């Protein structure tokens, strides 16, 4: 998993509340069990005018040329609600997004994102609105997300602080998923195993 320390990137917005996981990655695309290849189906029902995905919707932000290559997504309250599909952060990451900034997130999506290297940043509604306004006002506007200092820097230079559980921050800073986190304690695990009776191993 790619570590997340500081990232500066082009920002794109979807100015909607309650964006659920079925909109993020519709159910008909969930048959794969590997993490790659989901980006093309991200927000399928909004990005395309046809079921086959051959006709991009020119009105949808992710299809607009000014947002091509965006790596930071701005959204509104309760992002990632709905069913607990881990494919949702897989699709967002595979598309090239590194961070989602919104006033609030669904709990399960929030945890799944951290476990897959996607940083969910919760700011106030007013702060998210300011970021959206600045991004809308200037093509190519970039936002910086600094996990080392837990700050977001807007295109105009305004700074907003955010909080993240230290355990989640540690995993993201070091690029550790659940397996990687366990392996980082391999020496302690081995030491413990030598201290217990054989029949208990």
Curated annotation (Swiss-Prot):
One of its GO terms (biological process) is L-leucine biosynthetic process. Keywords: Amino-acid biosynthesis, Branched-chain amino acid biosynthesis, Leucine biosynthesis, Lyase. The lineage of its organism: Bacteria, Pseudomonadati, Pseudomonadota, Gammaproteobacteria, Alteromonadales. Belongs to the LeuD family. LeuD type 1 subfamily. NCBIfam families: leuD, PRK01641.1. Catalyzes the isomerization between 2-isopropylmalate and 3-isopropylmalate, via the formation of 2-isopropylmaleate. PANTHER family: 3-ISOPROPYLMALATE DEHYDRATASE SMALL SUBUNIT, 3-ISOPROPYLMALATE DEHYDRATASE SMALL SUBUNIT 2-RELATED-RELATED. Heterodimer of LeuC and LeuD. It catalyses: (2R,3S)-3-isopropylmalate = (2S)-2-isopropylmalate. CDD domains: IPMI_Swivel. Pathway: Amino-acid biosynthesis; L-leucine biosynthesis; L-leucine from 3-methyl-2-oxobutanoate: step 2/4. This is 3-isopropylmalate dehydratase small subunit. It holds the Pfam family Aconitase_C. GO terms for molecular function: 3-isopropylmalate dehydratase activity.
